[in-house]
Amino acid sequence: MILKSQANKLKFTKQAKVFHYGSISLITEPCRSAHMKATEEAKEAGALLSYDPNLREPLWPSPEEARTQIMSIWDKADIIKVSDVELEFLTRNKTIDDETAMSLWHPNLKLLLVTLGEKGCRYYTKDFHGSVETFHVDAVDTTGAGDSFVGALLNQIVDDQSVLEEEERLRKVLRIANACGAITTTKKGAIPALPTDCEALSFLKRQVEQ
């Protein structure tokens, strides 16, 4: 289905608590304009805007076009998640550290996340930053791991965004998000591999017992 701007008259953008989006719809029109309109409507309605660029470089006309378009809506987001590969691509810096990550910070951002694969994730807010280790599993397919991570995060904060202001609570949320990402890699496919709440909690319980 091709998303067109008039389709944004649908109520979902004005009723959403969270509006999560990527960058692929920015590649061509009419999707680009529809994307921008939907983002604006969700923001005006008070939704939490979550952005995962989800870089697919071969789909773009050029690396420069990808960077330009991805960054064109950067300062709209409340939460941004990038992978270490995306961080390197966007900053042109092969050094994955706090300074490089914070070069992507914008004044209205509430949470910046950098996922590091088997090394876990780093988190940044205006008041604190740190890292959370992930769980070692026998991975068979990493497809969907990032989506699982973000989905678990948003699921836990959608009704209580104060989590973003309290580091210990945020770390607990990210631990569960890391668990969901890890579980997803143990199965083939993206959607079929996404864990339920019960599966994630059972996984965490087993980790404690080991």
From Swiss-Prot:
**SUPFAM superfamilies referenced in this protein's UniProt entry, alphabetically:** Ribokinase-like
Q: Which domain of life is it from?
A: Eukaryota
> What's the stated role of this polypeptide?
May play an important role in maintaining the flux of carbon towards starch formation.
State the UniProt keywords alphabetically: ATP-binding, Carbohydrate metabolism, Kinase, Nucleotide-binding, Transferase
Which GO cellular component term is one of those annotated? cytosol
| Record-listed E.C. numbers | 2.7.1.4
Name assigned to this protein: Putative fructokinase-8
Q: What is its pathway?
A: Glycan biosynthesis; starch biosynthesis
Which sequence ranges form a coiled-coil region, renumbered to this chain? none
Q: One GO BP annotation here?
A: fructose metabolic process
Write out the similarity annotation. Answer: Belongs to the carbohydrate kinase PfkB family.
Catalytic activities:
D-fructose + ATP = D-fructose 6-phosphate + ADP + H(+)
MF annotations from Gene Ontology: ATP binding; fructokinase activity
**Organism ancestry:** Eukaryota, Viridiplantae, Streptophyta, Embryophyta, Tracheophyta
